[in-house]
Amino acid sequence: MLNIKWIRENQELFDEKLSQRFIEPMSSKIAMLDGEKRKITCLIQEFQHARKVKSKILGNMASKSGEEFEGLQRDVKHINEKLEELEQDLNNNNELNELLNMLPNIPDEEVPYGMDESMNKLVRTYGETNPNALNKQHFELGTKLNLMDFEQTAKISGARFVTLKGDLAKLERALINFMIDVHTKEFDFFEISPPVLVRDNAMYNAGQLPKFAEESFATTNGYRLIPTAEVSLVNIVADTIIPREKLPMRYVAYTPCFRSEAGSSGRDTRGMIRLHQFGKVELVSITTTEESKNEHEYITNASETILQKLNLPYRVMLLCTGDMGFAAKKTYDIEVWLPGQKQYREIASCSNCGDFQARRMKARYKEFGSNETTLVHTLNASGLPIGRTMVAILENYQNEDGSITIPDVLINYMGGLQKITTYSE
């Protein structure tokens, strides 16, 4: 959520930042609604003060009867009725909060202006892409190996699900353990095993609700399946005040993730690129205002390191204003090279959300000996999605005979297996 005080004091700049997100000016409407809310709040405070004064006089009166006493009683009763009416008006005046809840984060000054991914800025590349490399797509390779099943799985769960078998299931498990080990041992992230069912308020805190309600799966009894472990991890600090010396707090978690993929009809309908259920290792950092920028580079480096150790070619893109996620103020996308598609595809997003999520979930920190609190900054990064990493391995490590060479760093995690070959039932 955006800072209403900042909007109030920077209306022209606020509208300019909204225009960079291709949103019409909102400052005038917000100022009007904010003014109405503040007026009601001021009246409530005045009536509360008047009630306190009159109640004190009533309590100190020697005679609990008579015209003066009864008149004061009537005054207090009238004040209570008026307060109830005003508080009801305040509770019903949801338009301001509803409007603020639908507005995305303000872009950082370093974010390039642009409407879509074509305007993203190349930051760096890693590894070499070979235009003459073997170029079968991952789903061709997986099904030929008899270790990736879409057809039978569709009978069980419908489209956008997959069943992995044998050595591919083992590769999935190896990747999870490898990624967690790198992040905990080399980057000092603390491993968490969080719930994947959360309440709506947790989704709201993370910026998933109300705007993206249709993109998540909801149960019939008030829970939602997480679209990313970011939701569970950032909420660890909801409604807390953290001692400054404990920051940064860095969390890593592997979870299954669930997305309805609303609006993705016709996109990536084959294979494992876009599934309703997928596994992902997620990174979250909680830090201070001053360290936020450096922490963004740190968490991005952690994600990149996984691809470097797997020797997968990739590039890092700085997203433009029109391509950034809702809660982000600045985002790097990491795109891995897929020979089967002959293009780079997104494999990770690394975002600095500033105090946007923290304001929603009331997460603060304070210096030792101080009573003043400051909103934390939250950052998140994919570290990485297991399915898309497996896609990249299958396509970049494929052999002429359809077998898949295991990347060196995964051989021990695969129990010494160096190559995945066709499974014969």
Swiss-Prot record:
Gene Ontology biological-process annotations: selenocysteine biosynthetic process; seryl-tRNA aminoacylation
Residues annotated for ATP binding in this entry: 259-261, 346-349
Keyword Repressor: no
This protein's GO CC annotations: cytoplasm
Catalytic activity: tRNA(Ser) + L-serine + ATP = L-seryl-tRNA(Ser) + AMP + diphosphate + H(+); tRNA(Sec) + L-serine + ATP = L-seryl-tRNA(Sec) + AMP + diphosphate + H(+)
Cell compartment(s), UniProt: Cytoplasm
SUPFAM superfamilies: Class II aaRS and biotin synthetases, tRNA-binding arm
Comment, domains: Consists of two distinct domains, a catalytic core and a N-terminal extension that is involved in tRNA binding.
Assembly: Homodimer. The tRNA molecule binds across the dimer.
Family recorded in the similarity comment: Belongs to the class-II aminoacyl-tRNA synthetase family. Type-1 seryl-tRNA synthetase subfamily.
Function: Catalyzes the attachment of serine to tRNA(Ser). Is also able to aminoacylate tRNA(Sec) with serine, to form the misacylated tRNA L-seryl-tRNA(Sec), which will be further converted into selenocysteinyl-tRNA(Sec).
Protein name: Serine--tRNA ligase
